[in-house]
Amino acid sequence: MGRFIFVSFGLLVVFLSLSGIGADQECLPGWSFYEGHCYKVFDEYKNWTDAEQYCTEQENGGHLVSFHNREEVDFVVKLGYTILKADIVWIGLRDFWRECHWGWSNGAQLDYKGWNDEPNCFIAYTVGNKWLRRKCSSTQQFVCKSPA
């Protein structure tokens, strides 16, 4: 009887782990889940256009990260600094037409702002939550975001 219970419990544990119960199965391995999206920090240096293209070519698609509230920024800041030990990453904000028509690379509405007045692409300092405009041709590490 005891062996039957032990085997049954063992099979239950295996079943639950394979079904994703209690595990973070919303994102691909190496990606982190937050509020319906998956995020991944890339420790590679690319210009803004190449970083955005790299994000769209990932298995789960996506774009450079867009922010819609302070809590999302805090999540990405913690994720970025933990992985990179650096404090600057590309984000998906850019003046696409160079006429101050700002928009996220994924088409989302710009509803949260934090920057100064310089070139047409944006970096985020992962410490201090400052957004700065930077030449799109410069290279930085970056964070991709995709729907879960």
Curated annotation (Swiss-Prot):
One Gene Ontology term, aspect cellular component: extracellular region
Flavoprotein in keyword set: no
Tissue specificity statement from the Swiss-Prot or TrEMBL entry: Expressed by the venom gland.
SMART domains documented for this protein: CLECT (SM00034)
Secretion signal, residue range per the UniProt entry: 1-23
Positions glycosylated per UniProt: N47
SUPFAM superfamilies referenced in this protein's UniProt entry, alphabetically: C-type lectin-like (SSF56436)
Compartment annotation: Secreted
Disulphide-bridged cysteine pairs: C27-C38, C55-C144, C121-C136
Pfam families xrefs: Lectin_C (PF00059)
Location of the C-type lectin domain: 34-145
Function according to Swiss-Prot or TrEMBL: Mannose-binding lectin which recognizes specific carbohydrate structures and agglutinates a variety of animal cells by binding to cell-surface glycoproteins and glycolipids. May be a calcium-dependent lectin.
Subunit field text: Homodimer; disulfide-linked.
The protein's name: C-type lectin 2
Source lineage: Eukaryota, Metazoa, Chordata, Craniata, Vertebrata
